[in-house]
């Protein structure tokens, strides 16, 4: 937004990265707005003339300055212009607490000044606004402090996700890989800690909540509730500080109604109700020739003109901010804890990625459900939704696709390990007789048994992977393309074995071998029967007729 860009140019007002729109409005826009209003009020208070009093004509300039300073430092009071300044006390025995006796002679009635409502909030207005600005910053500090204690560096993750250099393909790919590695490590740590079932973590679960898989989400909602409670509390303080009477609690609503309708419509103005009065009264004493004289002067509070407008604006702003915060809180509760919404969030992003993906397939939906519950968890899913708000849709889609590819690889490894665990007990001796018979057998026989068991295990694993690939048919394109297999020539190994196992040939044999050299060289290039039957070579070798000699020489 334009307002955020402008405020970012002002020192000490820059935003932190790990915040959403509501947090930015509370801790960034509102707090800076309150600071600006406090500066405006302070400039009027200390740099201008906040109050001007009408003094008697015999006052010198020094007495005028004194009366202005005194009435600014001391609270003033307000009496409506429709009422008399003095009133008669019927019973002379009455004690007047806030009045000054004018006539007092015997049993004659006394007249006293009315002690109107004391007004002193304008003296502390700038400090009150600064206090409110600090309160609006507090929930963000709570989120920043406690979220930094988790393994997920939320601020750094959002900074990388919203980096402007992600428009460069290489930079975007590097950032996605870095985020995948970081998230994979954090999620693996949380899963491993949960499987260990540490006793202190189970007993003192509340004190060890930062080790749980929902810690970041919990702190985020605590900050949301803190934002809501803060704006409600600030609204109450604003009314209590500036509107002392309960009958004036609808003053903000009446003022906005007056602004919209263009007239008071029967509402009281400051002349009647005394809310933000422009004219007040001030009493002070002077000594003249040893005698104490009481003076009552009438003062003009120009500062209340600004204070009234600030109150009306803040009253409406807090109402809108409360409604917006409540709506945002319930929307996040729905987004995090609604399973259907979470599944559609992942399915829609997987459907938008480059890999063909059918979100209506039941198998795909099952994998997405397992991906959310077993792999991401509450914090992982919440962080992806937070990234979706900060980063662009292309970056978010590719990041979710990369994490889903990692999940598919982990599922394939888990299926392979289950198959191996099912086959390995078949290769172990069941009783002591088999152990003794295994010891008495020849080494070649035991080697053949192990080799056959290994071949059977590899066949079972390959068949299991084949069945898994057919089940995960839409996700095959996540895998890297098959690299061309290298052709290995086993002639050198056969020659070395033949040299080691045989003696030096006779001269006649050398001649015979030299005559048959082309045939022998061609035969030496072909793998032996043992190598052909070995499972380690059957995957790489092809018939020799398909391999040209030039390619062999170039390879070697």
UniProtKB/Swiss-Prot annotation:
Coiled-coil region: none
UniProt feature, compositional bias: Low complexity: 514-527
Polar residues biased stretches: 435-447, 463-474
GO molecular function, one term: gap junction channel activity
Keyword Calcium: no
Annotated function: Structural component of the gap junctions.
Glycosylation sites: 267
Topology class, membrane: Multi-pass membrane protein
Record-given protein name: Innexin-7
UniProt source species: Caenorhabditis elegans
Compartments, record wording: Cell membrane; Cell junction, Gap junction
Entry-linked Pfam families: Innexin
Feature: compositional bias, Basic and acidic residues: 452-461, 539-556
Swiss-Prot/TrEMBL keywords: Cell junction, Cell membrane, Gap junction, Glycoprotein, Ion channel, Ion transport, Membrane, Transmembrane, Transmembrane helix, Transport
GO biological process terms on file: monoatomic ion transmembrane transport
Keyword Membrane in annotation: yes
InterPro entries: Innexin
Region listing for Disordered, in residue ranges: 431-556
Family stated for the protein in its record: Belongs to the pannexin family.
Chain segments annotated as transmembrane: 21-41, 127-147, 213-233, 310-330
Biased composition (Basic residues): 500-513
């Amino acid at each position: 937004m334009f307002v955020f860009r402008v405020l970012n140019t002002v020192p000490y007002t820059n935003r932190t990265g790990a915040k959403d729109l509501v947090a930015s409005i509370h801790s960034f826009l509102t707090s800076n707005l309150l600071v600006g209003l406090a500066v405006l009020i302070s400039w009027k208070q200390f740099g201008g003339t906040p109050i001007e009093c009408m003094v008697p004509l015999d006052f010198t300039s020094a007495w005028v300055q004194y009366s202005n300073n005194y009435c600014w430092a001391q609270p003033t009071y307000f009496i409506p212009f429709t009422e008399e300044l003095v009133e008669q006390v019927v019973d002379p025995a009455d004690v007047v607490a806030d009045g000054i006796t004018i006539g007092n002679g015997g049993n004659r009635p006394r007249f006293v000044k009315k002690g109107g409502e004391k007004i002193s909030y304008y003296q502390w207005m700038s400090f009150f606004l600064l206090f409110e600005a600090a309160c609006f910053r507090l929930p963000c500090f709570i989120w920043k402090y406690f979220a930094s204690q988790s393994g997920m560096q939320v601020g750094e993750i959002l900074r990388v996700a919203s980096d402007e250099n992600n428009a460069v393909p290489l930079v975007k790919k590097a950032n996605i890989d870095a985020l995948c590695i970081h998230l994979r490590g954090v999620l693996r740590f949380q899963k491993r800690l949960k499987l260990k079932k540490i006793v202190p973590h189970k007993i003192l679960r509340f004190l060890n909540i930062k080790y749980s898989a929902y810690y970041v989400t919990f702190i985020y909602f605590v900050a949301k509730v803190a934002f809501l409670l803060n704006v409600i509390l600030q609204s109450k303080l604003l009314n209590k500080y500036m509107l002392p009477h309960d009958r004036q609690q609808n003053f903000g609503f009446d003022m906005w109604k007056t602004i919209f309708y263009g007239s008071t419509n029967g509402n009281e103005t400051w002349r009647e109700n005394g809310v933000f009065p422009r004219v007040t009264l001030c009493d002070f004493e002077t000594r003249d020739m040893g005698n104490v004289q009481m003076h009552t002067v009438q003062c003009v509070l120009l500062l209340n003109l600004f204070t009234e407008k600030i109150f009306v604006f803040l009253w409406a702003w807090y109402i809108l901010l409360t409604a917006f915060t409540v709506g945002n809180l319930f929307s996040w509760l729905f987004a995090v804890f609604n399973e259907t919404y979470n599944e559609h969030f992942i399915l829609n992003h997987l459907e938008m990625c480059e890999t063909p993906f059918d979100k209506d397939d039941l198998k795909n939906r099952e994998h997405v459900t397992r991906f959310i519950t077993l792999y991401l968890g509450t914090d992982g899913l919440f962080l992806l939704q937070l990234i979706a708000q900060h980063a662009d849709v292309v970056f978010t889609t590719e990041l979710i696709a990369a994490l889903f590819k990692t999940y598919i690889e982990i599922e394939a490894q888990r299926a392979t390990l289950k198959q191996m665990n099912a086959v390995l007990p078949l290769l172990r001796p069941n009783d002591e007789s088999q152990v003794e018979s295994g010891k008495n057998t020849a080494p070649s026989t035991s080697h053949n048994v192990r080799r056959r068991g290994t071949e059977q295990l590899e066949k079972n694993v390959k068949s299991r992977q084949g069945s898994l690939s057919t089940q995960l048919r839409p996700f095959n394109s996540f895998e890297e393309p098959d690299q061309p297999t290298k052709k290995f020539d086993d002639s050198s190994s056969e020659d070395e074995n033949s040299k080691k196992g045989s003696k030096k040939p006779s001269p006649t044999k050398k001649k015979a071998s030299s005559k048959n050299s082309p045939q022998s060289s061609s035969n030496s290039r072909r793998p032996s029967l043992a190598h052909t039957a070995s499972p380690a070579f059957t995957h790489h070798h092809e018939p020799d007729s398909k391999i040209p000699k030039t390619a062999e020489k170039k390879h070697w």
